[in-house]
């Protein structure tokens, strides 16, 4: 893997979504683990806002990232023409950038289709158009999601595009209808509107012909806390759907701990992967010159069933907290439990998400490897849920 690490020495990277869950991990690795020449980070609102988010996410590593003197922040917005960049900033990107990593997304499961299509499809297509003017660009990495295939029946899911239905409608026509009508007949086939939007983005990005740079699409499954980088258990709850779901379901009197397992397939594998393994997958495939679709799912880590996760979580909650929950003393102010329950019902399926293009990385330790040497997945999960239940309920069993 040494050659792959050295590849970064000549790369100037433009990163969107750099203050998000995956983006922070990518930025950490690009600055402190890899000899990356330079990283431009798009930040919305102000540079100070981005710095505050980065410091909150990785307080102990924050100064080292800045002290690398290889990170330059640029104020902009993926929803605006030309990313809302100053003309001088855009010219600098056009002249210097060799790799674009698009990790920006709005993963809200509540966002209606007519809004999600703008942030999770249109913005990506406009970014692709913009970067066609980057004179030194070699590769475009677009971060997608395995949820793009949530319309499929149970079974094997390969690293490829699947048609929406037997007739396979033109994705441009599907997009046009959504923009005109604000809805789609295909929405209900997906776990959430977000997933349909990401599906269309994939189809339309890969439909582009004769581009002068490589296109790589990485599909993570649900992202979980880091096992190593930037530190164990790194990750904010907003970027980890399972934590949000547990919090809202467990604290809702109509669901609660006693009802968590009812109506959900407890034997289904809960497909989740640590955020740092997703980052390693992205960066290793970039350096290898991979193109097309790469999946980063639970098979690259340690599979757990929904029942195992639920039992471990319940065992981590102190009896006093359980009684408080049952008496309704611990409540969530927003009534999001029905939405999360519906999503879990749709998501808890017997899909077998294949990650064949990355299996070889499990044999490699180090910066870009996926080896689990020295990592105890069961102990990690137990400690993780002790941390989560302590934060959610204020108490833990230990």
Task: Map each language-model feature to its residues.
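Glycine- and acidic
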Residues: 11-12, 105-115, 182-191, 202, ...
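Short beta-strand/turn micro-motifs composed of small residues
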Residues: 43, 144, 297
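NAD(P)-dependent short-chain dehydrogenase/reductase
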Residues: 156-177, 193-195, 199, 203-270, ...
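Mid/C-terminal beta-alpha module of Rossmann-like enzyme folds, strongest
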Residues: 281-371, 380-385, 389-396
């Amino acid at each position: 893997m040494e050659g792959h690490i050295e590849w970064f020495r000549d790369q100037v990277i433009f990163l969107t979504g750099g203050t998000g869950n995956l983006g922070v991990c990518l930025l950490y690795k690009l600055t402190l683990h890899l000899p990356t020449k330079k990283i431009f980070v798009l930040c919305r609102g102000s540079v100070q806002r981005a710095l505050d988010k980065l410091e909150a996410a990785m307080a102990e590593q924050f100064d080292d990232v800045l002290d690398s003197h290889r990170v330059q922040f640029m104020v902009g917005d993926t929803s605006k023409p030309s990313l809302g960049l100053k003309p001088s900033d855009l010219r600098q990107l056009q002249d210097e950038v060799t790799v674009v990593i698009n990790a920006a997304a709005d993963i809200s499961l509540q966002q209606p289709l007519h809004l999600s299509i703008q942030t999770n499809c249109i913005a990506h297509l406009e970014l692709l158009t913009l970067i066609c003017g980057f004179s030194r660009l070699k590769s475009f990495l677009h971060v997608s999601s395995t949820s793009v295939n949530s319309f499929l029946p149970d079974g094997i899911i390969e690293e490829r595009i699947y048609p929406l239905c037997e007739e396979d409608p033109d994705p441009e026509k599907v997009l046009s209808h959504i923009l005109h009508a604000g809805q789609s007949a295909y929405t209900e086939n997906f776990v959430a509107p977000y997933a349909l939007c990401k599906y269309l983005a994939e189809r339309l990005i890969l439909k582009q012909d004769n581009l002068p740079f490589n296109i790589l699409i990485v599909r993570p499954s649900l992202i979980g806390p880091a096992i190593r980088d930037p530190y164990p258990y790194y990750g904010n709850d907003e970027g980890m759907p399972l934590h949000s779901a547990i919090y809202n379901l467990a604290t809702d009197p109509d669901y609660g701990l006693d009802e968590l397992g009812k109506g959900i397939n407890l034997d289904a594998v809960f497909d989740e992967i640590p955020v740092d393994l997703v980052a390693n997958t992205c960066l290793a495939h970039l350096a290898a010159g991979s193109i097309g679709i790469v999946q980063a799912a639970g098979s690259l880590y340690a599979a757990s069933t929904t029942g195992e996760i639920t039992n471990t979580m319940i065992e981590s909650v102190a009896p006093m907290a359980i009684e408080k929950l049952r008496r309704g003393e611990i409540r969530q102010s927003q009534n999001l439990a029905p939405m999360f329950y519906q999503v879990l019902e749709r998501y808890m399926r017997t899909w077998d998400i294949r990650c064949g293009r990355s299996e070889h990385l499990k044999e490699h330790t180090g910066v870009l490897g996926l080896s689990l040497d020295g990592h105890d997945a069961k102990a990690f999960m137990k400690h993780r849920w002790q941390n989560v239940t302590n934060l959610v309920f204020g108490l833990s069993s230990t």
